[in-house]
Amino acid sequence: MNTTKEIIDDLKEGKLVIIVDDEDRENEGDLVCAADKVNSDIVNFMAKHGRGLICLTLTKEKCSILGLKQMTDSNESSNKTAFTVSIEAKEGITTGISAQDRATTILAAVNPDATKKDIAQPGHVFPLQAMDGGVPVSYTHLTLPTSSWV
């Protein structure tokens, strides 16, 4: 296990870390990186070794700016994960599924100047709206105190 400072330093350097959530939630580890540091190598590693969805955690404010609506009006999943409709960058991609295209989409979404005109729906990246309250609410990637995680 690493200290919080070590993890934050690693994220600032563009490294991947594994965040383990509460055993009463999903009891899993997530590969996490700072979204503004993502590149095709990181996305490829996540897809190959993580073997799950490539998700992008965004604040409620950022979801609003990008015009991202919740995937469903009545979230009946056991963990109430706040998925929005999937996204794609409007420019700079081909089919959207390649590691490079997904990295481009993530970078487009987290650009401080990004608006809904920069994003198309649906796509191959799955945004998650972060919970208010931060880490004291629940130990998951959705509550980490930051603006954007992949």
Where are the regions that the model predicts?
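Structural motif
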Residues: K15-I18, D30-L31, G52-L56, A82-V85, ...
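Fold-independent oxyanion-binding glycine-rich loops
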Residues: V20-E23, A35-D36, G50, L58-E61, ...
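Glycine-rich, N-terminal phosphate-binding loop and its surrounding beta-alpha-beta segment
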Residues: I42-A99
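Hydrophobic alpha-helical hairpins/lids featuring a short glycine-rich hinge
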Residues: E76-A130
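Conserved small/polar residues in nucleotide/adenosyl-binding loops
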Residues: T140-T146
